Amino acid sequence: MATSHSPTGQTVAIIGAGPTGLSMLKTLRNDGFDATIFERRSRVGGLWSYTEDETMTTALPNTTANISKYTCGFTDYPMPDHYPPFLSQSQFQEFLESYSTHFGLQDHIVFRTSVTEVERNVDNTKWCVKMTTEGKPVTREFDKVVCCHGYQTQAKAPTFPGQEEFQGRIMHAQQFRRPTDFKGQNVVFVGMSSSASDVVPLVVQNAAKVYVSHRRGTWIFGRWRNGLPTDLLVNYTRRQMGYFMQSWFPDLSAKLSKMATTFLMKKYGNLDPSWRLLEDAPPLSLNLTACMDTMLDLLREGKITSMHGVESFLGGKKVKFMDGTVLDDIDTVIFCTGYRADFSILPFVEHSTPENDAQDNAFGGAPIPRLYMNIFPPKHAESMAILIASTYGKNNGFSFADVISMAISNIWRGVSGDMIPSVPEMERAIDAHHQWIAGRWVKENTTDVCAVKQWEFQRFLHEAAGTGLENLGWGWKGWWTWLRDPKMSYLMRHGVETAYAFRYFETGKRAVWPGARDAIIHTNALVKKLRAEKLAETKKE
């Protein structure tokens, strides 16, 4: 059993001042670490901090969160009641700045600083963090490093035959800033993703014609369902049941998920077969979904045209699609094809390709980072945490950021140090995980190679953080919670899945928040009020 030790004097560099970086800074400093954030932007917020710099991924001024304020937030800092159910980019920015100010984090953030490389120093005792501050190169040494610079940093863009001869403009959604740049143009979007749902409605208002090219169908969810935010359909109990099914009955879970999603999609009304939205859509368990209800409206109104996947460029301004259709007057092609994490500043991270016994089961994806629990490089688990490679691992936006930061702090302080096995054990676990990734890739080759097993990933981090959620389980602790406080037991199991629950139970591993109980009750009351208001509106109609 590992022993707890004081981290006083240990320096930590945190890369990135988005929600995860801010949570990490607050937690580490509260636990005694001398932590500092290095952020390339001029303010906190990560991608929620709008920037004109086209090399950075940013939420646009019209971007609206996909997750409601009721389930998205920090564990000890509630969102103000006056915010709407779904926050805008500026409101998220405002909230994150208020969080930073409230907890006195600003004094420990170095802005306008880009980290260019992280490597071990000459005597292998510390990390050398190379950075550029105000255009000047600087190198500083730290005991530990946490990478929170996001998994949406590098734009992914396909290449097509004849692309170099295209006489129009080809760009990625990452570069999009001003919709007026496309006034009077014919524009093709490649990919039907969350970024497309942000950009397409803006371009439609200015362009002459807009086409959306997609090779296959996609699952489209609206933010609202029966008058309530869609994310409120999931509560703690349903999530745990889902994890159980995914873990023990993955094929059945995938089939049931597809059936349920198809049912929900059809609730949006008639879907024109020519849109191909339900045609060969990738399994939900292997790909993330998008809130794209606005896209459905644009399709119905004829303001955008659904096209098959791009096959090639034919010279001039011609684009050929996989069904043989050719459009010969396209001014701009915008790739909405996603992002990948940037490992270029972390040259020490090892990558490998899963071995396959059978050729027909061969993994053909890119080499996968070798990280235990998709966080810790085995040789440096005691001093390096990489939080840019855990796709599907988080629930409810950045509400999980506090769980991750508490877990890492506890592991490094020795409070949960026994949860990190030996290097050989970590290597074996990584090999097994990569085989799981390979199996997913064979079924769906667009799946993210940084995916995690949610049930395994979250169980590990909750235990390391000491959130005490085992008190909501089906064991004796769960029954004891119900007997002592049936109201809270019911609200946390079947009510709104709030972040405050992560600081409700006393476990001795992390600080509880005295306001957690009231915040959980208040959030559920707000949702109950919202439901009543929506019901009243429906009756009036």
Give residue spans per PLM region.
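Rossmann-like dinucleotide-binding core of oxidoreductases
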Residues: 4-44, 49, 97, 138-140, ...
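Glycine/threonine-rich phosphate-binding loop and adjacent beta-strand/alpha-helix elements that clamp
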Residues: 67, 336-413
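Feature captures the FAD/FMN-dependent oxidoreductase FAD-binding
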Residues: 84-149, 299, 313
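C-terminal, flexible cofactor-proximal segment of oxidoreductases
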Residues: 111, 218-222, 383-541
